[in-house]
From Swiss-Prot:
NAD listed as a keyword: no
GO CC terms in record: extracellular region
Keywords: Amidation, Neuropeptide, Secreted
Naturally occurring in which organism (per UniProt): Ascaris suum (Pig roundworm)
Record GO biological process: neuropeptide signaling pathway
The name this protein goes by in its record: FMRFamide-like neuropeptide AF9
Residues modified as Phenylalanine amide: 9
Location in or out of the cell: Secreted
Family: Belongs to the FARP (FMRFamide related peptide) family.
Predominant location: secreted
Amino acid sequence: GLGPRPLRF
């Protein structure tokens, strides 16, 4: 899951 913030890695 991406969690609370969208990770852009």
